[in-house]
Swiss-Prot record:
It comes from Rhizobium johnstonii (strain DSM 114642 / LMG 32736 / 3841) (Rhizobium leguminosarum bv. viciae). Its EC number is 2.3.1.129. InterPro entries: Acetyltransf_C, Acetyltransf_C_sf, Hexapep, Lipid_A_LpxA, Trimer_LpxA-like_sf. This is Acyl-[acyl-carrier-protein]--UDP-N-acetylglucosamine O-acyltransferase. It comes from the Bacteria. CDD domains: LbH_UDP-GlcNAc_AT (cd03351).
Amino acid sequence: MSTIAESARIHPMAVVEDGATIGEGVKIGPFCHVGPHVVLHANVELLSHAIVTGRTVIGKGTRIFPMAVVGGDPQSVHHGGEETTLTVGANCTIREGVTMNTGTADFGGQTIVGDNNLFLANSHVAHDCRVGNHVIMSNNVMLAGHVVIEDRVILGGGSAVHQFTRVGRQAFVGGLSAVSYDVIPYGMLNGNPGLLSGLNVVGMTRAGVDRAVIHRVRRAYKSIFEGPGSVRENAAAIREEYADCEQAVHILDFIAADSDRALSSPTRGQKG
Protein backbone atom coordinates (compact mmCIF):
# COMPACT_ATOMS: atom_id res chain seq x y z
CA MET A 1 0.00 0.00 0.00
CA SER A 2 1.22 3.50 -0.81
CA THR A 3 2.03 6.05 1.88
CA ILE A 4 0.61 9.39 0.76
CA ALA A 5 0.81 12.52 2.92
CA GLU A 6 -2.45 14.39 3.46
CA SER A 7 -1.11 17.58 1.91
CA ALA A 8 0.01 15.87 -1.31
CA ARG A 9 -1.95 16.82 -4.43
CA ILE A 10 -2.30 14.09 -7.03
CA HIS A 11 -4.19 14.69 -10.25
CA PRO A 12 -6.93 12.10 -10.81
CA MET A 13 -5.40 11.19 -14.17
CA ALA A 14 -1.99 10.41 -12.66
CA VAL A 15 -0.94 6.85 -11.79
CA VAL A 16 0.68 6.26 -8.40
CA GLU A 17 1.35 2.56 -7.96
CA ASP A 18 0.83 0.76 -4.67
CA GLY A 19 3.95 0.93 -2.52
CA ALA A 20 5.06 4.44 -3.47
CA THR A 21 5.83 6.95 -0.71
CA ILE A 22 4.55 10.47 -1.34
CA GLY A 23 5.67 13.22 1.06
CA GLU A 24 4.10 16.41 2.34
CA GLY A 25 3.28 19.05 -0.23
CA VAL A 26 4.10 16.87 -3.24
CA LYS A 27 2.32 17.80 -6.48
CA ILE A 28 1.76 15.20 -9.19
CA GLY A 29 0.25 16.42 -12.45
CA PRO A 30 -1.91 14.66 -15.03
CA PHE A 31 -0.60 11.62 -16.87
CA CYS A 32 2.37 11.20 -14.54
CA HIS A 33 3.45 7.70 -13.54
CA VAL A 34 5.05 6.95 -10.16
CA GLY A 35 6.35 3.43 -9.66
CA PRO A 36 5.78 1.19 -6.62
CA HIS A 37 9.28 1.61 -5.14
CA VAL A 38 9.55 5.37 -5.57
CA VAL A 39 9.99 7.83 -2.69
CA LEU A 40 9.09 11.48 -3.32
CA HIS A 41 10.17 13.71 -0.45
CA ALA A 42 8.42 16.92 0.62
CA ASN A 43 7.42 19.48 -2.01
CA VAL A 44 8.57 17.49 -5.01
CA GLU A 45 6.63 18.50 -8.12
CA LEU A 46 5.97 16.29 -11.14
CA LEU A 47 4.57 18.18 -14.09
CA SER A 48 2.33 16.42 -16.59
CA HIS A 49 3.66 13.26 -18.24
CA ALA A 50 6.71 12.95 -15.96
CA ILE A 51 7.71 9.38 -15.10
CA VAL A 52 9.54 8.32 -11.94
CA THR A 53 10.14 4.60 -11.75
CA GLY A 54 12.51 1.98 -10.33
CA ARG A 55 13.93 2.13 -6.83
CA THR A 56 14.26 5.88 -6.94
CA VAL A 57 14.37 8.52 -4.21
CA ILE A 58 13.72 12.16 -5.13
CA GLY A 59 14.87 14.82 -2.65
CA LYS A 60 12.69 17.63 -1.34
CA GLY A 61 11.77 20.49 -3.61
CA THR A 62 12.95 18.86 -6.83
CA ARG A 63 10.86 19.61 -9.95
CA ILE A 64 10.53 17.13 -12.81
CA PHE A 65 9.17 18.38 -16.13
CA PRO A 66 7.12 16.66 -18.86
CA MET A 67 8.49 13.60 -20.63
CA ALA A 68 11.40 13.14 -18.23
CA VAL A 69 12.01 9.50 -17.27
CA VAL A 70 13.79 9.24 -13.94
CA GLY A 71 14.83 5.86 -12.55
CA GLY A 72 14.67 3.69 -15.64
CA ASP A 73 16.71 0.51 -15.91
CA PRO A 74 20.40 0.94 -16.75
CA GLN A 75 21.19 0.87 -20.46
CA SER A 76 23.83 -1.80 -20.03
CA VAL A 77 24.20 -5.27 -21.52
CA HIS A 78 25.38 -6.44 -18.09
CA HIS A 79 22.12 -5.56 -16.33
CA GLY A 80 20.17 -8.67 -15.43
CA GLY A 81 17.17 -7.11 -13.71
CA GLU A 82 18.84 -6.69 -10.31
CA GLU A 83 17.32 -4.28 -7.78
CA THR A 84 19.49 -1.21 -8.21
CA THR A 85 18.82 2.39 -7.22
CA LEU A 86 18.83 6.06 -8.18
CA THR A 87 19.01 8.85 -5.60
CA VAL A 88 18.37 12.46 -6.62
CA GLY A 89 19.04 15.21 -4.09
CA ALA A 90 17.07 18.28 -3.04
CA ASN A 91 16.05 21.29 -5.12
CA CYS A 92 17.07 19.92 -8.48
CA THR A 93 15.39 20.96 -11.73
CA ILE A 94 14.96 18.16 -14.26
CA ARG A 95 13.68 19.55 -17.54
CA GLU A 96 11.81 18.03 -20.46
CA GLY A 97 13.00 14.71 -21.81
CA VAL A 98 15.78 14.15 -19.28
CA THR A 99 16.65 10.52 -18.58
CA MET A 100 18.38 9.19 -15.47
CA ASN A 101 19.08 5.49 -14.95
CA THR A 102 19.59 3.33 -11.89
CA GLY A 103 22.96 1.67 -11.22
CA THR A 104 24.28 -1.75 -12.14
CA ALA A 105 24.84 -4.55 -9.65
CA ASP A 106 28.45 -5.15 -10.66
CA PHE A 107 29.43 -1.62 -9.55
CA GLY A 108 27.48 -1.15 -6.32
CA GLY A 109 24.08 -0.65 -7.87
CA GLN A 110 23.75 3.09 -7.23
CA THR A 111 23.43 6.19 -9.36
CA ILE A 112 23.72 9.27 -7.14
CA VAL A 113 22.82 12.87 -7.97
CA GLY A 114 23.40 15.68 -5.47
CA ASP A 115 21.52 18.86 -4.57
CA ASN A 116 20.66 22.07 -6.44
CA ASN A 117 21.46 20.75 -9.89
CA LEU A 118 19.99 21.90 -13.21
CA PHE A 119 19.46 19.32 -15.95
CA LEU A 120 18.30 20.95 -19.18
CA ALA A 121 16.18 19.29 -21.85
CA ASN A 122 17.13 15.85 -23.13
CA SER A 123 20.26 15.50 -21.02
CA HIS A 124 21.16 11.99 -19.84
CA VAL A 125 22.67 10.57 -16.65
CA ALA A 126 23.67 6.94 -17.18
CA HIS A 127 24.03 4.07 -14.74
CA ASP A 128 26.43 4.36 -11.79
CA CYS A 129 27.18 8.05 -12.32
CA ARG A 130 28.04 10.35 -9.41
CA VAL A 131 26.92 13.94 -9.89
CA GLY A 132 27.80 16.49 -7.21
CA ASN A 133 26.01 19.68 -6.17
CA HIS A 134 25.25 22.89 -8.10
CA VAL A 135 25.99 21.20 -11.43
CA ILE A 136 24.56 22.53 -14.70
CA MET A 137 24.05 20.07 -17.55
CA SER A 138 22.91 21.96 -20.64
CA ASN A 139 20.62 20.60 -23.35
CA ASN A 140 21.53 17.22 -24.83
CA VAL A 141 24.52 16.58 -22.56
CA MET A 142 25.28 12.87 -22.31
CA LEU A 143 27.01 11.19 -19.38
CA ALA A 144 28.06 7.61 -20.05
CA GLY A 145 28.16 5.04 -17.27
CA HIS A 146 30.31 5.50 -14.16
CA VAL A 147 31.10 9.17 -14.83
CA VAL A 148 31.96 11.39 -11.84
CA ILE A 149 30.98 15.06 -12.01
CA GLU A 150 32.23 17.11 -9.07
CA ASP A 151 30.52 20.19 -7.59
CA ARG A 152 29.73 23.31 -9.65
CA VAL A 153 30.71 21.85 -13.01
CA ILE A 154 29.09 23.36 -16.12
CA LEU A 155 28.67 21.10 -19.15
CA GLY A 156 27.85 22.91 -22.40
CA GLY A 157 25.08 21.79 -24.73
CA GLY A 158 25.62 18.60 -26.66
CA SER A 159 28.81 17.63 -24.86
CA ALA A 160 29.45 13.94 -24.24
CA VAL A 161 31.45 12.38 -21.41
CA HIS A 162 33.11 8.97 -21.90
CA GLN A 163 32.42 6.20 -19.38
CA PHE A 164 34.50 6.20 -16.17
CA THR A 165 35.68 9.77 -16.81
CA ARG A 166 35.95 12.34 -14.00
CA VAL A 167 35.24 16.05 -14.36
CA GLY A 168 36.70 18.06 -11.48
CA ARG A 169 35.16 20.75 -9.34
CA GLN A 170 34.05 23.92 -11.12
CA ALA A 171 35.39 22.80 -14.49
CA PHE A 172 33.75 24.17 -17.63
CA VAL A 173 33.17 21.99 -20.69
CA GLY A 174 32.29 23.80 -23.91
CA GLY A 175 29.32 22.89 -26.06
CA LEU A 176 29.64 19.88 -28.39
CA SER A 177 32.88 18.81 -26.71
CA ALA A 178 33.95 15.17 -26.50
CA VAL A 179 35.27 14.47 -23.01
CA SER A 180 37.34 11.31 -23.33
CA TYR A 181 39.77 11.89 -20.45
CA ASP A 182 39.60 13.30 -16.92
CA VAL A 183 39.24 17.09 -16.67
CA ILE A 184 41.12 18.74 -13.80
CA PRO A 185 39.24 20.91 -11.28
CA TYR A 186 38.80 24.50 -12.50
CA GLY A 187 39.84 23.47 -16.00
CA MET A 188 38.24 24.55 -19.29
CA LEU A 189 37.88 21.94 -22.00
CA ASN A 190 36.71 22.42 -25.58
CA GLY A 191 36.56 20.55 -28.84
CA ASN A 192 36.51 17.06 -30.29
CA PRO A 193 38.81 15.60 -29.17
CA GLY A 194 38.49 17.66 -26.02
CA LEU A 195 41.59 19.61 -25.03
CA LEU A 196 42.24 21.88 -22.07
CA SER A 197 42.20 25.57 -22.95
CA GLY A 198 43.24 26.96 -19.58
CA LEU A 199 41.42 27.60 -16.32
CA ASN A 200 37.82 28.59 -15.66
CA VAL A 201 38.84 32.02 -14.38
CA VAL A 202 35.35 33.47 -14.84
CA GLY A 203 33.84 30.71 -12.72
CA MET A 204 36.48 31.09 -10.02
CA THR A 205 35.95 34.86 -9.94
CA ARG A 206 32.18 34.45 -9.65
CA ALA A 207 32.75 32.03 -6.78
CA GLY A 208 34.67 34.73 -4.91
CA VAL A 209 38.18 33.35 -5.35
CA ASP A 210 40.71 36.12 -4.76
CA ARG A 211 42.66 37.36 -7.79
CA ALA A 212 45.98 36.55 -6.13
CA VAL A 213 44.82 32.97 -5.56
CA ILE A 214 43.74 32.67 -9.19
CA HIS A 215 47.21 33.87 -10.22
CA ARG A 216 48.83 31.14 -8.10
CA VAL A 217 46.56 28.48 -9.55
CA ARG A 218 47.54 29.65 -13.04
CA ARG A 219 51.19 29.27 -12.12
CA ALA A 220 50.52 25.77 -10.80
CA TYR A 221 48.67 24.89 -14.03
CA LYS A 222 51.66 26.05 -16.10
CA SER A 223 54.07 24.02 -13.96
CA ILE A 224 51.90 20.91 -14.25
CA PHE A 225 51.48 20.96 -18.02
CA GLU A 226 54.71 22.65 -19.12
CA GLY A 227 57.15 21.10 -16.65
CA PRO A 228 59.95 18.70 -17.59
CA GLY A 229 58.29 15.47 -16.51
CA SER A 230 54.93 13.79 -16.96
CA VAL A 231 51.84 15.57 -15.67
CA ARG A 232 51.76 13.44 -12.54
CA GLU A 233 55.48 13.90 -11.93
CA ASN A 234 55.18 17.65 -12.34
CA ALA A 235 52.18 17.76 -10.00
CA ALA A 236 54.01 15.82 -7.31
CA ALA A 237 57.04 18.11 -7.62
CA ILE A 238 55.07 21.28 -6.78
CA ARG A 239 52.87 19.90 -3.99
CA GLU A 240 54.89 21.43 -1.15
CA GLU A 241 55.03 24.84 -2.85
CA TYR A 242 51.24 25.00 -3.12
CA ALA A 243 50.28 23.26 0.12
CA ASP A 244 48.59 26.44 1.41
CA CYS A 245 46.43 26.97 -1.70
CA GLU A 246 43.13 25.09 -1.46
CA GLN A 247 42.36 25.23 -5.17
CA ALA A 248 45.82 24.07 -6.24
CA VAL A 249 45.77 21.25 -3.68
CA HIS A 250 42.44 20.05 -5.05
CA ILE A 251 43.93 19.92 -8.54
CA LEU A 252 47.00 18.03 -7.29
CA ASP A 253 44.88 15.55 -5.32
CA PHE A 254 42.69 14.99 -8.38
CA ILE A 255 45.74 14.25 -10.54
CA ALA A 256 47.23 11.90 -7.94
CA ALA A 257 44.03 9.89 -7.46
CA ASP A 258 43.53 6.51 -9.08
CA SER A 259 41.46 6.69 -12.25
CA ASP A 260 40.41 4.48 -15.14
CA ARG A 261 41.08 7.33 -17.55
CA ALA A 262 44.11 9.43 -18.44
CA LEU A 263 44.13 13.19 -17.94
CA SER A 264 42.99 15.73 -20.50
CA SER A 265 45.76 18.11 -21.45
CA PRO A 266 46.35 21.21 -23.60
CA THR A 267 47.94 19.12 -26.37
CA ARG A 268 46.63 16.02 -28.08
CA GLY A 269 49.63 13.82 -27.39
CA GLN A 270 49.99 14.56 -23.68
CA LYS A 271 47.83 12.43 -21.39
CA GLY A 272 49.57 12.55 -18.00
